[in-house]
Protein backbone atom coordinates (compact mmCIF):
# COMPACT_ATOMS: atom_id res chain seq x y z
CA UNK A 1 0.00 0.00 0.00
CA UNK A 2 1.39 3.37 -1.08
CA UNK A 3 0.39 5.15 2.14
CA UNK A 4 2.14 2.59 4.36
CA UNK A 5 5.26 2.69 2.21
CA UNK A 6 5.28 6.46 2.57
CA UNK A 7 5.10 6.20 6.37
CA UNK A 8 7.93 3.67 6.47
CA UNK A 9 10.10 5.88 4.26
CA UNK A 10 9.51 9.11 6.17
CA UNK A 11 9.19 8.22 9.85
CA UNK A 12 9.84 5.58 12.46
CA UNK A 13 7.13 4.75 14.99
CA UNK A 14 7.38 2.95 18.30
CA UNK A 15 4.94 2.15 21.08
CA UNK A 16 5.84 2.82 24.72
CA UNK A 17 4.86 -0.44 26.44
CA UNK A 18 4.49 1.34 29.79
CA UNK A 19 2.39 4.36 28.89
CA UNK A 20 0.81 3.00 25.70
CA UNK A 21 1.84 6.21 23.92
CA UNK A 22 3.03 6.18 20.31
CA UNK A 23 6.26 8.02 19.54
CA UNK A 24 7.64 9.04 16.15
CA UNK A 25 10.93 10.26 14.71
CA UNK A 26 12.16 11.10 11.21
CA UNK A 27 13.35 7.96 9.43
CA UNK A 28 16.92 7.27 10.48
CA UNK A 29 16.73 9.61 13.47
CA UNK A 30 16.44 8.88 17.18
CA UNK A 31 14.76 12.07 18.43
CA UNK A 32 11.41 10.48 19.22
CA UNK A 33 8.48 12.75 20.03
CA UNK A 34 4.93 12.03 21.12
CA UNK A 35 2.62 11.39 18.16
CA UNK A 36 0.07 14.06 19.04
CA UNK A 37 -3.02 14.94 17.06
CA UNK A 38 -1.08 17.85 15.57
CA UNK A 39 1.76 15.53 14.53
CA UNK A 40 -0.71 13.12 12.94
CA UNK A 41 -2.31 15.92 10.93
CA UNK A 42 1.13 17.11 9.81
CA UNK A 43 2.01 13.63 8.53
CA UNK A 44 -1.25 13.44 6.58
CA UNK A 45 -0.82 16.91 5.06
CA UNK A 46 2.83 16.31 4.13
CA UNK A 47 1.83 13.05 2.45
CA UNK A 48 -0.92 14.82 0.52
CA UNK A 49 1.62 17.42 -0.62
CA UNK A 50 3.53 14.57 -2.27
CA UNK A 51 0.41 13.12 -3.83
CA UNK A 52 0.00 10.29 -1.29
CA UNK A 53 -3.54 9.58 -0.08
CA UNK A 54 -2.71 8.94 3.57
CA UNK A 55 -5.97 9.04 5.51
CA UNK A 56 -6.55 9.44 9.22
CA UNK A 57 -8.11 5.97 9.28
CA UNK A 58 -5.05 4.36 7.67
CA UNK A 59 -2.70 6.16 10.05
CA UNK A 60 -4.80 5.09 13.02
CA UNK A 61 -4.78 1.46 11.91
CA UNK A 62 -1.02 1.59 11.39
CA UNK A 63 -0.43 3.08 14.84
CA UNK A 64 -2.54 0.37 16.49
CA UNK A 65 -0.98 -2.55 14.64
CA UNK A 66 1.89 -4.97 15.16
CA UNK A 67 3.81 -3.26 12.35
CA UNK A 68 5.37 -0.74 14.73
CA UNK A 69 8.03 -1.54 17.31
CA UNK A 70 7.36 -1.97 21.02
CA UNK A 71 9.71 0.12 23.16
CA UNK A 72 10.46 -0.45 26.83
CA UNK A 73 12.17 2.63 28.35
CA UNK A 74 13.41 0.57 31.29
CA UNK A 75 15.11 -1.94 28.99
CA UNK A 76 16.71 0.89 27.03
CA UNK A 77 18.12 2.40 30.22
CA UNK A 78 19.43 -0.95 31.44
CA UNK A 79 21.07 -1.65 28.08
CA UNK A 80 22.80 1.75 28.20
CA UNK A 81 24.66 0.92 31.42
CA UNK A 82 28.30 -0.07 31.48
CA UNK A 83 29.26 -3.56 32.59
CA UNK A 84 29.04 -3.92 36.37
CA UNK A 85 32.39 -3.13 37.99
CA UNK A 86 31.74 -5.30 41.05
CA UNK A 87 30.93 -2.42 43.41
CA UNK A 88 27.97 -3.09 45.74
CA UNK A 89 26.08 0.19 45.45
CA UNK A 90 22.77 -1.23 46.68
CA UNK A 91 24.10 -1.75 50.20
CA UNK A 92 25.22 1.89 50.40
CA UNK A 93 21.78 2.96 49.21
CA UNK A 94 19.97 0.74 51.71
CA UNK A 95 22.10 2.11 54.55
CA UNK A 96 20.59 5.55 54.01
CA UNK A 97 17.58 4.22 55.91
CA UNK A 98 18.17 4.14 59.67
CA UNK A 99 16.61 0.95 61.02
CA UNK A 100 17.01 -1.59 63.79
CA UNK A 101 16.02 -4.43 61.44
CA UNK A 102 19.18 -6.55 60.92
CA UNK A 103 17.74 -8.03 57.72
CA UNK A 104 16.95 -4.69 56.08
CA UNK A 105 19.97 -4.51 53.75
CA UNK A 106 19.61 -8.08 52.49
CA UNK A 107 15.85 -7.73 51.97
CA UNK A 108 16.21 -4.34 50.26
CA UNK A 109 18.78 -5.83 47.91
CA UNK A 110 16.46 -8.72 47.07
CA UNK A 111 13.54 -6.35 46.53
CA UNK A 112 15.52 -4.21 44.08
CA UNK A 113 16.47 -7.32 42.10
CA UNK A 114 12.80 -8.33 41.97
CA UNK A 115 11.76 -4.85 40.86
CA UNK A 116 14.21 -4.76 37.95
CA UNK A 117 13.27 -8.32 36.99
CA UNK A 118 9.63 -7.26 36.73
CA UNK A 119 10.61 -4.31 34.53
CA UNK A 120 11.89 -6.72 31.92
CA UNK A 121 9.01 -9.19 32.16
CA UNK A 122 10.83 -11.86 34.11
CA UNK A 123 8.84 -14.07 36.44
CA UNK A 124 9.17 -13.54 40.20
CA UNK A 125 8.07 -16.40 42.42
CA UNK A 126 5.07 -15.07 44.32
CA UNK A 127 5.97 -16.73 47.60
CA UNK A 128 9.29 -14.83 47.55
CA UNK A 129 7.78 -11.42 46.77
CA UNK A 130 9.04 -8.58 48.97
CA UNK A 131 7.37 -5.17 49.47
CA UNK A 132 9.34 -2.77 51.70
CA UNK A 133 7.37 -0.85 54.33
CA UNK A 134 9.22 2.20 55.67
CA UNK A 135 7.81 3.53 58.94
CA UNK A 136 8.89 6.82 60.48
CA UNK A 137 7.81 10.24 61.60
CA UNK A 138 6.37 12.76 59.16
CA UNK A 139 9.03 14.78 57.36
CA UNK A 140 11.82 12.21 57.65
CA UNK A 141 12.09 11.88 53.86
CA UNK A 142 10.51 8.47 53.34
CA UNK A 143 8.68 9.45 50.16
CA UNK A 144 11.65 11.48 48.92
CA UNK A 145 13.86 8.41 49.31
CA UNK A 146 11.48 6.37 47.16
CA UNK A 147 11.34 9.12 44.55
CA UNK A 148 15.10 9.07 43.92
CA UNK A 149 15.33 5.29 43.54
CA UNK A 150 14.67 5.61 39.81
CA UNK A 151 17.20 7.29 37.50
CA UNK A 152 16.13 10.73 36.17
CA UNK A 153 15.16 9.38 32.74
CA UNK A 154 12.68 6.94 34.31
CA UNK A 155 11.16 9.07 37.06
CA UNK A 156 8.02 9.78 35.08
CA UNK A 157 7.21 6.11 35.77
CA UNK A 158 7.19 6.65 39.54
CA UNK A 159 4.02 7.60 41.39
CA UNK A 160 2.83 8.00 44.93
CA UNK A 161 -0.63 9.16 43.84
CA UNK A 162 -2.51 5.97 44.65
CA UNK A 163 -6.06 5.73 45.92
CA UNK A 164 -6.58 2.31 47.44
CA UNK A 165 -10.33 2.65 47.22
CA UNK A 166 -10.15 2.30 43.43
CA UNK A 167 -9.11 -1.18 42.31
CA UNK A 168 -9.21 -0.17 38.64
CA UNK A 169 -6.83 2.72 39.27
CA UNK A 170 -4.40 0.52 41.19
CA UNK A 171 -4.50 -2.05 38.38
CA UNK A 172 -3.62 0.63 35.82
CA UNK A 173 -0.84 2.12 37.94
CA UNK A 174 0.77 -1.31 38.38
CA UNK A 175 1.08 -1.86 34.62
CA UNK A 176 2.02 1.72 33.62
CA UNK A 177 4.68 2.48 36.24
CA UNK A 178 8.02 1.05 37.32
CA UNK A 179 7.78 1.99 40.99
CA UNK A 180 4.76 2.67 43.21
CA UNK A 181 4.91 4.27 46.63
CA UNK A 182 1.78 3.86 48.73
CA UNK A 183 2.19 6.90 50.94
CA UNK A 184 0.57 6.80 54.37
CA UNK A 185 -0.29 3.12 53.88
CA UNK A 186 -1.46 2.68 57.47
CA UNK A 187 -3.54 5.84 57.43
CA UNK A 188 -5.98 5.22 54.59
CA UNK A 189 -8.24 2.34 53.58
CA UNK A 190 -6.32 -0.41 55.33
CA UNK A 191 -9.24 -2.75 54.65
CA UNK A 192 -8.01 -2.97 51.06
CA UNK A 193 -4.52 -4.09 52.01
CA UNK A 194 -5.16 -7.70 50.84
CA UNK A 195 -6.15 -6.44 47.38
CA UNK A 196 -3.02 -4.32 47.15
CA UNK A 197 -0.80 -7.22 48.18
CA UNK A 198 -2.42 -9.35 45.49
CA UNK A 199 -1.89 -6.73 42.79
CA UNK A 200 1.74 -6.10 43.68
CA UNK A 201 2.55 -9.81 43.88
CA UNK A 202 1.41 -10.56 40.33
CA UNK A 203 4.41 -11.14 38.09
CA UNK A 204 2.42 -10.51 34.90
CA UNK A 205 -0.30 -7.93 35.63
CA UNK A 206 -2.86 -7.24 32.92
CA UNK A 207 -5.07 -4.17 32.84
CA UNK A 208 -8.32 -4.01 30.89
CA UNK A 209 -9.28 -0.40 30.32
CA UNK A 210 -12.62 0.99 29.20
CA UNK A 211 -14.14 -0.17 25.90
CA UNK A 212 -12.42 -3.55 26.07
CA UNK A 213 -8.85 -2.43 25.36
CA UNK A 214 -6.37 -4.69 27.14
CA UNK A 215 -2.77 -3.91 28.02
CA UNK A 216 -0.86 -7.16 27.88
CA UNK A 217 2.05 -8.10 30.15
CA UNK A 218 5.37 -6.56 29.19
CA UNK A 219 7.48 -8.96 27.14
CA UNK A 220 10.67 -10.46 28.63
CA UNK A 221 14.10 -9.36 27.40
Regions found by a protein language model. Name each.
Residues 51, 60, 148, 187, ...:
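Terminal, non-catalytic protein-protein interaction segments that mediate quaternary/complex assembly
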Residues 12-15, 155-157, 204-207:
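Short secondary-structure junctions
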Residues 1-88, 99-103:
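N-terminal nucleic-acid engagement/recognition segments and initiation subdomains in replication
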Residues 175-177, 220-221:
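Short, well-ordered alpha-helix to beta-strand connector turns
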Residues 121-124, 164-169, 185-186, 202-219:
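Conserved Walker
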Residues 65-176:
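P-loop NTPase catalytic core of nucleic-acid-dependent motor ATPases
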Residues 177-201:
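Conserved AAA+/SF3 P-loop NTPase catalytic/coupling segment centered on the Walker-B
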Residues 117, 151, 198-205:
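Short, intrinsically disordered, mixed-charge
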Amino acid sequence: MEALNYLKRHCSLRRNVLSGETMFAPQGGDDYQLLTREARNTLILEAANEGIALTDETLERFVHSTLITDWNPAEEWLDSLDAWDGTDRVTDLANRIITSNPDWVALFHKWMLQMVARWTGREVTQRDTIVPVIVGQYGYGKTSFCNILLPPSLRRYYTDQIKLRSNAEVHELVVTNLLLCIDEFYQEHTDQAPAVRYLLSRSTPVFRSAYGVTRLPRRPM
